[in-house]
Amino acid sequence: MSKVQSITRESWILSTFPEWGSWLNEEIEQEQVAPGTFAMWWLGCTGIWLKSEGGTNVCVDFWCGTGKQSHGNPLMKTGHQMQRMAGVKKLQPNLRTTPFVLDPFAIRQIDAVLATHDHNDHIDVNVAAAVMQNCADDVPFIGPQTCVDLWVGWGVPKERCIVVKPGDVVKVKDIEIHALDAFDRTALITLPADQKAAGVLPEGMDVRAVNYLFKTPGGNLYHSGDSHYSNYYAKHGNEHQIDVALGSYGENPRGITDKMTSADILRMAESLNTKVVIPFHHDIWSNFQADPQEIRVLWEMKKDRLKYGFKPFIWQVGGKFTWPLDKDNFEYHYPRGFDDCFTIEPDLPFKSFL
């Protein structure tokens, strides 16, 4: 059988997916976090891998799914939160635009799995399966009640799950995880298809979503999940020291308010008294495409007049950010390589070839 005859769609997928293979898994495992710092990697959407100076590994909102893949059904699912929000009928054209940079089934060293809320792009059955199958049998799954309900429904033992609500603190080795109030109004209208939201007092946010503050020996990270802007960010900023804050950013389609705008991101950062603000979530959905440079431009316009005490940082999926080493950087660039150029003699026809 010739080579072209032996290749199938399945063999093509297995040979190319996930696109980064285990490259990032290996990078994270090999990273030695220096004292007085913490390192984190962007996994796409709001997925974050955090590693402390003590070698503690936690992942938050790591999602390995995809968006729309076919024009087959032109209508939105009945009762979808966006349908409730805007009274739409047409299919939402939300295609995943970000590659898969971390292989969940190559994860071996992990100390906790967390989710901020139960939306499909923030909690993942594949991650749960991979951790259950390949990692230590005491790795906890931490999240609000709706997330724990999902994990247990997928087969994660109830005793492995920790339900958190605002005010709760969970210690995972040298990382202290504080569950804080979330402000994700979209989560409140994510309901069963046959349940009406109109005229009904919504279920409390605390069972559906939380924000997290990760206090590490080397600094503190605030993860806002899918939260919208809220004045309550200022309360969180008053009560906690926050070094780096992550906020869900995107260009909201007409009739929709689901992501923070550039102005919201700056207000969030100012309210939290953070030193660095990093937008995320704008990478993942084609119909919420947004340019994070807008945040930096607006920051430049306002920073002197409003005496901002923070800087924005524009990240790339799969990239690493180390606090405080990267606190004065504005943008991430993937490693460019070739730092060892001319360590051996080039093999060229003549010196002026290049």
Curated annotation (Swiss-Prot):
PANTHER family: L-ASCORBATE-6-PHOSPHATE LACTONASE ULAG-RELATED, UPF0173 METAL-DEPENDENT HYDROLASE MJ1163-RELATED. It catalyses: L-ascorbate 6-phosphate + H2O = 3-dehydro-L-gulonate 6-phosphate. Probably catalyzes the hydrolysis of L-ascorbate-6-P into 3-keto-L-gulonate-6-P. Is essential for L-ascorbate utilization under anaerobic conditions. Its cofactor is a divalent metal cation. Induction: Induced by L-ascorbate. Repressed by UlaR. Its EC number is 3.1.1.-. It comes from the Bacteria. It comes from Salmonella choleraesuis (strain SC-B67). One of its GO terms (cellular component) is cytoplasm. Pfam families: Lactamase_B_2. InterPro entries: L-ascorbate_6P_UlaG, Metallo-B-lactamas, RibonucZ/Hydroxyglut_hydro, UlaG-like_MBL-fold, UPF0173_UPF0282_UlaG_hydrolase. It is an enzyme of class 3 (hydrolase). Belongs to the UlaG family. Keywords: Cytoplasm, Hydrolase. Signal peptide: none annotated. This is Probable L-ascorbate-6-phosphate lactonase UlaG. The keyword Ribonucleoprotein does not apply. Pathway: Cofactor degradation; L-ascorbate degradation; D-xylulose 5-phosphate from L-ascorbate: step 1/4. One of its GO terms (molecular function) is L-ascorbate 6-phosphate lactonase activity. GO terms for biological process: L-ascorbic acid catabolic process. It is found in: Cytoplasm.
